[in-house]
C-alpha cells in the first residue's frame, strides 16, 4: 500500500486547502502508528493482489477494471479481495472478479448523479466508506476527491482499488470529519451520504459540512427520512432497523428547514426512494444480516421494531 500523500499536496497546491494538505501526511502517520488489530492482516490482503496494469478503466457507467489475465491470476485476485470482506458498498468488477457487495451503490449513484455537475470540482466525501462513490465522482469529471472515514477496513478496500489506479486523484483518509481543521472552506462540493442519522447533533453536522465548502459551494446530502411536515422528526426509542446509533430521521420539509437554519440557500430535494431488499441484501461478499432481516417479515413497510421502513432522500443546498 502506497500511503505517500505528496501527490495530494501537489494537487491542492494553490488552493485554499494547500496548508492543510501539506500537514496531512503527519496526521495520517500518527493514526497509522495507533492502527487497528486487524490492520496488518488487511494490508497483507491488499499486498497479495496480483500486479496487473488495467488496459480498460470504466468509472463513468460503473466501476470496472479489465486486463488480459489467466484463471490463476483471477483466482488470486478473488482470494485477496475476499480477505477484505465484508464488502458493503459497490459493486466492483476487477479483472473478471465481480465483487457483489451488500449495497447496490450504483443504484443510489444513478439517482444522485443526474442532478450534479462535478466537472473540474474539488470534492470532499464525508463518511466515504470504501470509496466506491469517490471513483464514480472521478468518472463524472471531478478534479480531485478526498474521502474521510475512520473505518480501517474501508481504508484498505479503497487501497485495493487504488493499487490499480495510482495516478488518479482520489485519496481516502482514515479520519472522522471532526479530525479535519475547522473552517477549511476549500471544497467546491461536499457529499454526506448515509451519515446524518448517525449524528446526535444533526444541525452541528450540517454546520461542519458548510465550513468545509467554499462560498458558493454545493452540499449533497443523502439521509434517512420519514413522512411528515416541517415539524416531523422520528427519534427511535432504541434501535432502528437493528441499528443502535440512529438518532434523528426528519421529514423532507423538516430537513429543508434544518438546512436553511444552518445557513444554506437554494435548498431542494431531488430524490426520495424507499430502500428495497434488492438494493441492500446479504451476498457471498457480505454474509452477515442485511435489510431483509431488519424488516417486519409480514410487512416490509415496517422495521422489526415497528417503525417506518428505510426511505432515503437526496437534498442539494448551496453555501452563500
Swiss-Prot record:
It catalyses: carboxy-S-adenosyl-L-methionine + 5-hydroxyuridine(34) in tRNA = 5-carboxymethoxyuridine(34) in tRNA + S-adenosyl-L-homocysteine + H(+). Pfam families: Methyltransf_9 (PF08003). Its EC number is 2.5.1.-. It comes from the Bacteria. Carboxy-S-adenosyl-L-methionine binds at residues 89, 103, 108, 127, 177-178, 193, 197, 312. It is an enzyme of class 2 (transferase). CDD domains: AdoMet_MTases. The keyword Ion transport does not apply. One of its GO terms (biological process) is tRNA wobble uridine modification. Keywords: Transferase, tRNA processing. GO terms for molecular function: methyltransferase activity; transferase activity, transferring alkyl or aryl (other than methyl) groups. Belongs to the class I-like SAM-binding methyltransferase superfamily. CmoB family. Homotetramer. Catalyzes carboxymethyl transfer from carboxy-S-adenosyl-L-methionine (Cx-SAM) to 5-hydroxyuridine (ho5U) to form 5-carboxymethoxyuridine (cmo5U) at position 34 in tRNAs. This is tRNA U34 carboxymethyltransferase. It comes from Stutzerimonas stutzeri (strain A1501) (Pseudomonas stutzeri). The lineage of its organism: Bacteria, Pseudomonadati, Pseudomonadota, Gammaproteobacteria, Pseudomonadales.
Amino acid at each position: 500500500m502506497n500511503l505517500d500523500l505528496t501527490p495530494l499536496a501537489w494537487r491542492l497546491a494553490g488552493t485554499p486547502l494547500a496548508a492543510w494538505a501539506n500537514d496531512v501526511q503527519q496526521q495520517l502517520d500518527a493514526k497509522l502508528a495507533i492502527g487497528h488489530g486487524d490492520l496488518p492482516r488487511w494490508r497483507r490482503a491488499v499486498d497479495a493482489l496480483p500486479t496487473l496494469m488495467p488496459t480498460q478503466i470504466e468509472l463513468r457507467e460503473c466501476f470496472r477494471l479489465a486486463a488480459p489475465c489467466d484463471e490463476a491470476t483471477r483466482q488470486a485476485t478473488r482470494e485477496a479481495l475476499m480477505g477484505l470482506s465484508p464488502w458493503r458498498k459497490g459493486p466492483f468488477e476487477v479483472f473478471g472478479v465481480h465483487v457483489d457487495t451488500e449495497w447496490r451503490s450504483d443504484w443510489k449513484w444513478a439517482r444522485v448523479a443526474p442532478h450534479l455537475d462535478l466537472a473540474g470540482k474539488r470534492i470532499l466525501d464525508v463518511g466515504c466508506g470504501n470509496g466506491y462513490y469517490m471513483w464514480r465522482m472521478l468518472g463524472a469529471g471531478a478534479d480531485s476527491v478526498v474521502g474521510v472515514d475512520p473505518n480501517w477496513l474501508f481504508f484498505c478496500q479503497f487501497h485495493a482499488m487504488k493499487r490499480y489506479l495510482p495516478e488518479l486523484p482520489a485519496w481516502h483518509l482514515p479520519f472522522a470529519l471532526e479530525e479535519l481543521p475547522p473552517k477549511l472552506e476549500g471544497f467546491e462540493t461536499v457529499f454526506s451520504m448515509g451519515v446524518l442519522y448517525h449524528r446526535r447533533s444533526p444541525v452541528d453536522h450540517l454546520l461542519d459540512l458548510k465550513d468545509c465548502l467554499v462560498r458558493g459551494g454545493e452540499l449533497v446530502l443523502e439521509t434517512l427520512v420519514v413522512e411528515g411536515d416541517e415539524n416531523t422528526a422520528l427519534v427511535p426509542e432504541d434501535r432502528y432497523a437493528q441499528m443502535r446509533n440512529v438518532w434523528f430521521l426528519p421529514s423532507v420539509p423538516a430537513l429543508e428547514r434544518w438546512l436553511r437554519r444552518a445557513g444554506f440557500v437554494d435548498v431542494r430535494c431531488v430524490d426520495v426512494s424507499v430502500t428495497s431488499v434488492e438494493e441492500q441484501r446479504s451476498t457471498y461478499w457480505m454474509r452477515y444480516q442485511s435489510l431483509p432481516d431488519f424488516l417486519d417479515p409480514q410487512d416490509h413497510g415496517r422495521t422489526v421494531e415497528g417503525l417506518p421502513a428505510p426511505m432515503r432522500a437526496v437534498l442539494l443546498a448551496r453555501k452563500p
